[in-house]
């Protein structure tokens, strides 16, 4: 049975999943009980780990623990931000086909290459499984959030990641818009409100200004930086500590030691969090590098000084969004903080001062608000009839201007940034040479006057134009942006009716359909491998638990008296051999563990039966022990039932 549609906040550092059920949004906890899950994937000699398990082993396995996929998705390898990030990543990123970045790892002893979409799809698969475990049903439909300032390539790539994860991506929505739903869902009445969403997460930053009235959420303007967040503050703290270590230890530089750097980063991130509630934090690392310990104390003031430039840069998009919306700061009724990095006191102070002392709204959980809004939108799109969400309408905007190149490399804009979407605009163009039989349509996004300074999304040819003097042919170009913010372009020769159409699926950070199909197959294969590994671990635990239970019970004096020392000692010897075998065969197959369990059961179960028949069942009045499984004797084939203990 298929479950309801879910909302996933696919974050740079953490992800969150939610569902709308029984007129309420439920944030779904993972198997560790945490309501957010690290966006981490790790590859070891034996298995693939996702989420908490991946992050927890990061210091031991830095080269094969992948995070920050969101900072790679939809980008080119030679992108300035990718090159900058590579200095901080312990894993290897190389230049792949079409200039797409490839992530290289060693998995089960083999070199493997992944695209960012595949890593993100693994995180999405984990979030899907968390939801399925909670709902007890399979999940297919999803709304995934992206930063409002993500460009076309990044949106397409995120949609592809959902497809690879076996999900039907109903809609891609902007993170601040989703957060606005979380803020405004229960605030019916009270007239029109101008709300500014300040969303500073682990890796991205967005500002959106919305007008909210009676369930209508209309985005007026959006601005941001897809490469600013908590990770950047961590980097500055790490760089400070590396310099400090050099100063204290005669110039010893730990920068090239990935494991030391990763341990330091983990402690710096922890210190950053502590500094949100305390005025100082201590970093203590035993044997950080060449046996040298590193201990230091960071004050909140020092941290703020290190990050001052980055903190202040968050106000630039705020000013830009206000200017684009035509509002001044006094017209903003509420400033809503979203994203874990808004817990930093200095960020809160900067915003408060910018808005002339207005206290920011802290009524929504900054880690969960985006997933909350995504779940509401998922419920609406899947036809949920709840009265609470029936009247809700989202009107979002295109974050960047879209246009095409005309003579001289000029950017001719068809859709201006902050235009409400979905939208459709057309314009007539012509040829600039006599008897020109074809035109090259080049589609760009960006705010600069010349196309060379903007981002090329794609290009296509319209051929078969009837030969005519320059300026005579009429070519109608139509730009159509769908609700996901993804662009379709059509060019038509008005005289012949001949047209060409393209959804922007160029190789600028985009996967081909063949690549997506291959990745879907591989994702299925990895899922099967994970399942196989899980069954192996389960059967190993089953064998170990059975052996230890039997060992404890058979070691009791009363049992030896009832059954005879020889029989008991023989069984205990079999159990000891089995436990030694498990110790030496940690990577055995599921069937091998099962066979070994049957062998041990074959020796022990007759003794169990004999005990029950003699009326001296464990747990009875003359017995202090107890077999797992309670009062009835276990069936010969399966042995006692043991409860799994993690």
Swiss-Prot record:
InterPro entries: ATPase_NBD (IPR043129), Heat_shock_70_CS (IPR018181), HSP70_C_sf (IPR029048), HSP70_peptide-bd_sf (IPR029047), Hsp_70_fam (IPR013126). Keywords: ATP-binding, Nucleotide-binding, Stress response. Pfam families: HSP70. Residues 613-646 are annotated as: Disordered. One of its GO terms (molecular function) is ATP-dependent protein folding chaperone. Disulfide bonds: none annotated. Belongs to the heat shock protein 70 family. This is Heat shock 70 kDa protein.
């Amino acid at each position: 049975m298929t479950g309801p549609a879910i909302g996933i906040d696919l974050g740079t550092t953490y992800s969150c999943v939610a569902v709308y059920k029984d007129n309420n949004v439920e944030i779904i906890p993972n198997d560790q009980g945490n309501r957010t899950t690290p966006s981490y994937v790790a590859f070891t000699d034996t298995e693939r780990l996702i989420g908490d398990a991946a992050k927890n082993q990061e210091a031991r396995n830095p080269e094969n623990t992948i995070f920050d996929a969101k900072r790679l998705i939809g980008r080119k390898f030679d992108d300035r931000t990718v090159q900058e990030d590579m200095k901080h990543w312990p894993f290897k990123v190389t230049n792949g086909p079409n200039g797409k970045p490839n992530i290289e790892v060693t998995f089960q002893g083999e070199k493997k290459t992944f695209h960012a979409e595949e890593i993100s799809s693994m995180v999405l698969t984990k979030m899907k499984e968390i939801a399925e475990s909670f709902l007890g049903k399979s999940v297919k439909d999803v709304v995934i959030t992206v930063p409002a300032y993500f460009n076309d390539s990044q949106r397409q790539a995120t949609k592809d990641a959902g497809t690879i994860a076996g999900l039907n991506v109903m809609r891609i929505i902007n993170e601040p818009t989703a957060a606005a739903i979380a803020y405004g869902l229960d605030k019916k009445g009270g007239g029109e409100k101008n709300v500014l969403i300040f969303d500073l997460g682990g890796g991205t930053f967005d500002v959106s200004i919305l007008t909210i009235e009676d369930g209508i959420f209309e985005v007026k303007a959006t601005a941001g930086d897809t490469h600013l967040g908590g990770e950047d503050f961590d980097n500055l703290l790490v760089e400070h500590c590396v310099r400090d270590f050099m100063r204290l230890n005669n110039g010893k530089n730990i920068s090239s030691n990935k494991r030391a750097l990763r341990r330091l980063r983990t402690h710096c991130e922890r210190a950053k969090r502590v500094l949100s509630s305390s005025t100082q934090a201590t970093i203590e690392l035993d044997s950080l590098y060449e046996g040298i310990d590193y201990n230091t104390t960071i004050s909140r003031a020092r941290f703020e000084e290190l990050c001052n430039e980055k903190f202040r840069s968050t106000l630039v998009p705020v000013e830009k969004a206000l200017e684009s919306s035509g509002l001044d700061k006094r017209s903003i009724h509420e400033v809503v903080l979203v994203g874990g990095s808004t817990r930093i006191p200095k960020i809160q102070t900067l915003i408060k001062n910018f808005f002339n002392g207005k206290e920011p709204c802290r009524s929504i959980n900054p880690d969960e608000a985006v997933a909350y809004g995504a779940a509401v939108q998922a419920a609406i799109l899947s036809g949920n009839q709840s009265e609470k969400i029936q009247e809700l309408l989202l009107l979002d905007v295109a974050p960047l201007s879209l246009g095409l190149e005309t003579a001289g490399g000029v950017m001719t804009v068809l859709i201006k940034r902050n235009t409400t979407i979905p939208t459709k605009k057309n314009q007539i163009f012509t040829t600039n040479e006599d008897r020109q039989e074809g035109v090259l349509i080049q589609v760009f996004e960006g705010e600069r006057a010349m196309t060379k300074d903007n981002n090329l999304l794609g290009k296509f040819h319209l051929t078969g134009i009837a030969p005519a003097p320059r300026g005579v042919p009429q070519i109608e170009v139509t730009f159509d942006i769908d609700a996901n913010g993804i662009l379709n372009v059509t060019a038509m020769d008005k005289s012949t009716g001949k047209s060409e159409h393209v959804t922007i699926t160029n190789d600028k950070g985009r996967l081909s359909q063949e690549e997506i199909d291959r990745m879907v197959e591989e994702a299925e294969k990895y899922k099967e491998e994970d399942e196989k590994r899980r069954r192996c671990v389960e059967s190993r635990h089953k064998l170990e638990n059975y052996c230890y239970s039997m060992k404890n019970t058979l070691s009791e004096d009363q049992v030896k008296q009832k059954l005879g020392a020889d029989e008991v000692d023989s069984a205990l010897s079999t159990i000891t051999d089995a436990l030694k075998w498990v110790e030496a065969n940690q990577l055995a197959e599921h069937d091998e563990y099962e066979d070994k369990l049957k062998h041990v059961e074959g020796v022990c179960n007759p003794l169990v039966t004999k005990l029950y028949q003699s009326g001296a069942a464990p747990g009875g009045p003359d017995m202090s022990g107890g077999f797992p499984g309670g009062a009835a004797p276990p069936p010969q084939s399966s042995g006692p039932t043991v409860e799994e203990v993690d």
